[in-house]
């Protein structure tokens, strides 16, 4: 029984290795491997290969406008008043009744993920995290899948630079909080 259990365990590991390799190749070819697509995208059937349906991501026009609004708020703010942070964007969207795909309210974590996800500039990273430990994998293990871009690479980079400059490791949080007397 122990020998059979060891053989089954080995076979299971081999199957997992081959499945992951196939999914990485599928992603490199630009196909979606499953799961729920990011906000702003929808899954469409791209082609049929025998009984298998190959799917790709397509921009969902209604949801994509929300993503563009979030990036605009992060760069310019409301009416050009200056860049907004995660919480300010979240509050603005919820106050103006802008909802998620499911009709829920936006949270700070959702805004953080949207502003930091390279999928929106046209490159989805498959296999970016270890599913067991939830840790980031090295960049060379990622399979990059080309998807339609919702924001330009320049807009994405401008948001990343803005977020990095306002990060607490670059600037003290007391200078970021509005209303701090002589804080600037």
Regions found by a protein language model. Give the residues of each.
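Conserved catalytic breakage-reunion loop centered on the nucleophilic residue
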Residues: 2-184
């Amino acid at each position: 029984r122990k020998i059979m259990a060891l053989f089954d365990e080995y076979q299971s590991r081999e199957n997992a290795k081959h499945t992951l390799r196939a999914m990485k190749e599928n992603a490199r070819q630009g196909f979606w491997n499953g799961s729920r697509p990011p906000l702003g995208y929808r899954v469409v059937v791209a082609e049929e290969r025998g009984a298998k349906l190959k799917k790709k991501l397509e921009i969902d026009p209604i949801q994509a406008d929300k993503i563009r609004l979030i990036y605009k708020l992060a760069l310019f703010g409301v009416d050009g008043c200056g860049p907004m942070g995660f919480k300010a964007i979240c509050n603005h969207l919820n106050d103006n009744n802008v909802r998620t795909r499911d009709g829920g309210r936006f949270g700070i974590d959702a805004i953080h993920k949207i502003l930091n996800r390279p999928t929106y500039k046209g490159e989805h990273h498959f296999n970016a995290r270890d599913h067991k430990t939830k840790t980031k994998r090295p960049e060379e293990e990622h399979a990059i899948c080309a998807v339609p871009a919702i924001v330009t690479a320049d807009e994405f980079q401008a948001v990343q630079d803005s977020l990095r400059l306002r990060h607490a490791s670059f600037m003290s949080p007391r200078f970021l909080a509005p209303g701090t007397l002589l804080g600037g």
